[in-house]
């Protein structure tokens, strides 16, 4: 498993726990807004949890246009 795959898998696990959905229902290419039916405030709440988990802080400009788990994992991996 590559570092990106590990990070993506961990993000998917965190999202599933946070929104109480089965992990199997989520995949790397999913648009989290559509797949989880969440709004931007809920996405920020999830992002805060993810940042705390990975001990990083992602600037807003790095998150513009990010809506799928794989791209989010790539941004996070670039900070680790």
Pin down the residues of each PLM region:
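Phosphopantetheine-dependent thiolation modules in NRPS/PKS and related acyl-activating systems
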Residues: 2-38, 47, 52-80
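Two-component histidine kinase catalytic core, primarily the HATPase_c
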Residues: 42
């Amino acid at each position: 498993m590559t570092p990106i795959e590990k990070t993506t898998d961990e993000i998917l696990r965190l999202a599933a726990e946070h929104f109480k959905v089965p992990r199997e229902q989520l995949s790397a290419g999913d648009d989290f807004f559509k797949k989880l039916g969440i709004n931007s405030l809920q996405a920020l709440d999830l992002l805060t949890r993810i940042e705390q988990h990975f001990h990083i802080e992602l600037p807003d400009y790095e998150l513009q246009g990010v809506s799928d788990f794989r791209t989010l994992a790539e941004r996070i991996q670039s900070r680790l």
